[in-house]
UniProtKB/Swiss-Prot annotation:
Subcellular location: Plastid, Chloroplast
The keyword Iron-sulfur belongs to this UniProt entry's keyword annotation: no
Protein name: Small ribosomal subunit protein uS13c
Gene name tied to this protein: RPS13
Gene3D superfamilies per the UniProt record, alphabetical: 1.10.8.50, 30s ribosomal protein s13, domain 2 (4.10.910.10)
Organism per entry: Spinacia oleracea (Spinach)
Amino acid sequence: MAHTLATPVAPSVSLICNTKLSVSLSSSSLAFRPVNPKNGGGLSIKCVRVGNVEIPNNKRVEYSLQYIHGIGRSRARQILCDLTLENKLTKELSEDELLQVRDEVTKYMIEGDLRRFNAIAIRRLKEIQCYRGVRHIQGLPCRGQRTKNNCRTLKRGKRVQIAGKKKPPGPK
């Protein structure tokens, strides 16, 4: 385990660095001697930003795009087909290919816009008091699923106790 060195730089800021990295402090500047990248130093980028979401760099593009809310398996494949891109690792994409992917993703309703759209649709159902809206209000499934056994995940927030063996009253 590497030892860390904490050196106060300003009253509210402290510098934490590896002991491999040498630090020279003067009154006016802070200078770092570069570390050999073979020894594990240096900057490594682990994510790519597409559609205001950081997608993983070490996975194939088809699976990386699925980290964006609103893009599933079929939509990710459709994006790759529209751009005629190979399904290679995200870090292997060139800048031009990455720009093409970003432009293609902006054509779809994703992330905040999609969440807002769904929230407005559910709010409208609740306001008009239709069956689906009432089921949303009650926290029950609204697509015809059984409720005797399998709607526990929807009712999780309410914590309804399941009828079972009753405990005998304790001694007073």
